[in-house]
């Protein structure tokens, strides 16, 4: 043993705890110097020797009716620093009171020593019944390993477990496979979540365990070597599984060394320390990203081979009595019971372009699957191949043909990614496979994000997409050729991780791809523009004032025509949705839809002049007047009297429903201060409407109070009338993007009234997000190119720290700057905010004022 257990001279909990802690210190200091299997074996043997010693100390060795048996992971001899100590005490008869007391003391001693104990005391018949009743118990028993006591009893248990009717092979397989299906669903059917569970994520250790359990039930094999010797896997598959298992074991062992409580989730804050233990180094976060790339590639290998071998087992051992139905697909492929098989061996080696034909057949019949023998041939052919499939002219034709087939993405591109074909086709794919982005914004690796973007585009064809994505659904359904949009999505993030602007580098890549694949010049220009500008609409909608005609004109000039606008809109929405499920909400949908509508109007009007909002303002007034006439008791005179105080900008930036709501509120208001919050009138968010005489620090008071109540602010609209009254609107949501419920709205109304009724500035105690301490975002202030002399547009990039807006607004007040508008965007740990400002003379900021503002923001947001 590397670090042996020393038998106790007397029963002493502290002595065992000391040995246990010394073992952990040995593992921490020597982790890099020993093979992981040696460390796991050493810990398993440490526990074995401890239990045998205690079995003797508590006098249980004298009782010939008892047998101590390791089960579960402990039975498999997979002991990690925080693994449960699972064992069975098998008894030939009901335990007497004296023996029961000894067992209780034995177990309690282990708990006192700091072990998490999972134990059961059962007779042979009780074990059999419990195993028959529960697949988890049955699985634990199948991994039983003798430790101490009556060995013949252990053999009797083994005989019971080998009975043909004790979980017959097919029933056992179906039960364990169903567990896998349910587990995959919990993890969104992907290995590529950026905070994965080493044990339970697809491709994790549980997928290896599934192979063990199937082989164990079928042949009695207890490890990968036994499975290889049984002929169930090929030597190449064995080598790949062994390498992947070894890496996951190292990561899990390191994770357990840095934690105090059992957990297998590789959270961001843990990835840094695990990477250090595994000696992954590099500037910034490169060490973590290198480790996670290797980790995700290991998951992918295990997931792929697990899927292949599970198929192989089902086809060759469980479906042997089914009638065989063979259907010819073409000269190279045939269908055997709905599984695609090759008609000649080595087809993929001799004619590699036929690999693309395999996935074409999947799109033609959605009932088809790929036979395990075909998957094996595919896997071996890809392992042997040195060049890229895209170098073959016939393969290029067949690759492009896929995009116009029904279910092209779900039926062809997704399995091509899963089985390594995309990596074999596109030279750039290998670099992004398993490439994570160490931030709180992205949920998936780059390759998984791209595939999910493609899937989202295809989803726009489904009838159920009409409600959440009405514009995209309409656009996508009328496209006759979706190939360009799919190719743009395939390349939009393909250059990430190389350094430089990934959009510009990706545009170069897609241009080369398009030329190689025979696209014409118009198509090449469209593709390169889409990839290079794939963030344009998202940035404009979320970080610009889209009600400003100049903003709309500049956006329209960049887009140029309706075809590009349609493509860009679909790509933008799919990209946002595929980045993080929580990002897309009705508020973002409204922003994108509004920009789409304005740009369409700009194209219709022509590009030689700004979009004229006069007609829209008048339409809003008339529609609001109609609503008020129908639904309120206000007269036209009363309405007009209220509207006289509202600047034209107010009617442009608010919908008719909002205007009608505000008008009714103002008509009923008898005080100088009005604060109302509603979900009814602002699409996509909860609206706060504030009406009062302008006052110092108003914005600061509002955002500080909102922050103290733990809401997300998405938009701030500051409108001041000529007589000094503000008509301010704030769009907020709960932190998870949901609308604010009634009780929370009333509570916030009360808090805002209190804050605005006093000159005292509100404060709240900042609560740091522990995840943020591992991220470093440099504060950056950018002033957009001055288009106007009456206002300044500023972008702020900073760590999304608690009270950020309160600090920023305090700087504005300190420098006597007026805030006209704000767009608040949080992207993971990063705040990307947009402000429109004027100085105290209602002019654009001077160069000196911009410099002073930049300096103060750095001082406040990055204190030394």
Swiss-Prot record:
Entries under SUPFAM superfamilies matching the protein: ACT-like, HD-domain/PDEase-like, Nucleotidyltransferase, Nucleotidyltransferase substrate binding subunit/domain
Gene: glnD
Regulation: Uridylyltransferase (UTase) activity is inhibited by glutamine, while glutamine activates uridylyl-removing (UR) activity.
ACT domain sequence ranges: 687-766, 793-864
This protein's domain notes: Has four distinct domains: an N-terminal nucleotidyltransferase (NT) domain responsible for UTase activity, a central HD domain that encodes UR activity, and two C-terminal ACT domains that seem to have a role in glutamine sensing.
Lineage of the organism: Bacteria, Pseudomonadati, Pseudomonadota, Gammaproteobacteria, Pasteurellales
One annotated GO biological process: regulation of nitrogen utilization
PROSITE patterns in alphabetical order: ACT, HD
Domain HD per the UniProt entry, residue ranges: 446-562
Top-level taxonomic group: Bacteria
A GO MF term: [protein-PII] uridylyltransferase activity
Annotated protein name in UniProt: Bifunctional uridylyltransferase/uridylyl-removing enzyme
């Amino acid at each position: 043993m590397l670090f042996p257990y020393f038998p106790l001279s007397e029963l002493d909990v502290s002595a065992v705890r000391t040995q246990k802690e010394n073992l952990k210190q040995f593992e921490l200091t020597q982790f890099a110097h020993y093979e992981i299997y040696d460390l796991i074996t050493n810990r398993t043997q440490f526990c074995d020797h401890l239990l045998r010693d205690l079995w003797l100390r508590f006098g249980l060795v004298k009782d010939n009716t008892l047998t101590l048996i390791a089960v579960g992971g402990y039975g498999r001899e997979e002991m990690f620093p925080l693994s449960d100590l699972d064992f069975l005490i098998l008894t030939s008869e009901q335990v007497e009171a004296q023996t029961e007391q000894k067992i209780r003391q034995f177990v309690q001693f282990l708990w006192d020593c700091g072990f998490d104990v999972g134990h059961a005391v059962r007779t042979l018949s009780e074990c059999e019944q419990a195993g028959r009743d529960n697949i988890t118990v049955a699985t634990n028993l199948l991994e039983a390993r003798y430790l101490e006591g009556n060995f013949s009893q252990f053999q009797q248990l083994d005989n019971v477990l080998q009975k043909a009717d004790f979980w017959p092979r097919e029933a056992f397989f179906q039960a364990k496979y169903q567990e896998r299906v349910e587990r995959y669903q919990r993890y969104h059917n992907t290995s590529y979540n950026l905070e994965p569970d080493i044990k339970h994520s697809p491709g994790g250790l549980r997928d290896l365990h599934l192979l063990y359990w199937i082989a164990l039930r079928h042949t009695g094999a207890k490890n990968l070597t036994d499975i290889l010797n049984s002929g169930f896997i090929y030597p190449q598959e064995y080598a790949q599984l062994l390498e992947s298992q070894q890496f996951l074991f190292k990561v899990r062992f390191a994770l357990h060394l840095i934690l105090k409580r059992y957990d297998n989730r590789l959270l961001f804050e843990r990835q840094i320390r695990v990477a250090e233990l595994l000696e992954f180094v590099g500037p910034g976060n490169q060490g973590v990203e290198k480790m996670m790339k290797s980790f995700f590639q290991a998951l992918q290998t295990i997931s792929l081979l697990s899927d292949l071998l599970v198929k192989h087992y089902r086809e060759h051992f469980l479906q042997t009595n089914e009638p065989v139905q063979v259907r010819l697909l073409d000269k190279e492929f045939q269908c055997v019971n709905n599984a695609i098989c090759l008609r000649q061996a080595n087809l993929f080696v001799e004619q590699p372009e036929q690999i693309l034909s395999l996935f074409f057949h999947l799109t033609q019949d959605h009932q088809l699957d790929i036979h395990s023998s075909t998957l094996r041939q595919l896997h071996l052919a890809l392992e042997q191949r040195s060049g890229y499939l895209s170098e073959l002219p016939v393969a290029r034709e067949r690759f492009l043909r896929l995009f116009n087939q029904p279910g092209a993405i779900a039926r062809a591109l997704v399995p091509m990614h899963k089985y390594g074909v995309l990596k074999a086709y596109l030279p750039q794919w290998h670099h992004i496979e398993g490439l994570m982005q160490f931030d709180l914004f992205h949920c998936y690796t780059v390759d998984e994000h791209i595939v999910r973007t493609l899937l989202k585009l295809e989803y726009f064809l489904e009838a159920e997409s009409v409600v959440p994505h009405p514009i995209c659904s309409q656009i996508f359904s009328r496209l006759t050729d979706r190939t360009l949009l799919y190719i743009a999505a395939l390349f939009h993030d393909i250059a990430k991780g190389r350094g430089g602007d990934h959009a510009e580098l990706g545009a170069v890549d897609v241009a080369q791809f398009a030329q190689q694949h025979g696209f014409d010049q118009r198509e090449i220009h469209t593709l390169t523009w889409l990839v290079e500008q794939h963030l344009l609409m998202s940035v404009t909608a979320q970080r610009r004032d889209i009600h400003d005609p100049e903003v709309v004109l500049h956006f329209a000039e960049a887009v140029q025509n309706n075809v590009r606008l349609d493509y860009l809109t679909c790509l933008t929405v799919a990209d946002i949705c595929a980045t993080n499920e929580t990002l897309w909400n009705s508020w973002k949908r409204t922003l994108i839809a509004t920009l789409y509508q304005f740009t369409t109007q700009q194209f219709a009007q022509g590009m030689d002049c700004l979009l004229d909002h006069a007609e829209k303002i008048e339409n809003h007034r008339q529609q609001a007047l109609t609503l008020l006439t129908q639904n309120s008791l206000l007269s036209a005179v009363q309405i007009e009297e209220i509207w006289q105080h509202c600047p034209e900008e107010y009617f442009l930036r608010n919908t008719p429903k909002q205007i009608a709501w505000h008008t009714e509120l103002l008509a009923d208001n008898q005080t100088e201060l009005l604060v109302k919050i509603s979900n009814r009138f602002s699409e996509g968010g909860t609206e706060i409407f504030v009406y009062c005489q302008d006052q110092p620090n108003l914005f600061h008071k509002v955002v500080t109070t909102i922050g103290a109540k733990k809401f997300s602010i998405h938009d701030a609209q500051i409108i001041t009338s000529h007589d000094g009254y503000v008509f301010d609107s704030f769009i907020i949501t709960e932190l998870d993007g949901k609308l604010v419920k009634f009780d929370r709205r009333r509570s916030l109304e009360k808090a805002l009234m209190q804050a605005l009724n006093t000159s005292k500035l509100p404060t709240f105690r900042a609560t740091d997000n522990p995840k943020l301490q591992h991220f470093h975002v440099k504060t950056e202030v950018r002033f957009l190119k001055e288009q106007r002399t009456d206002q300044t547009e500023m972008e702020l990039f900073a760590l999304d720290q608690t009270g950020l807006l309160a600090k920023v607004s305090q700087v504005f007040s300190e420098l006597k700057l007026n805030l006209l508008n704000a767009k608040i965007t949080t992207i993971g740990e990063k705040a990307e905010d947009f402000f429109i400002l004027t100085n105290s003379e209602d002019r654009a900021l001077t160069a000196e004022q911009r410099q002073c503002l930049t300096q103060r923001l750095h001082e406040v947001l990055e204190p030394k």
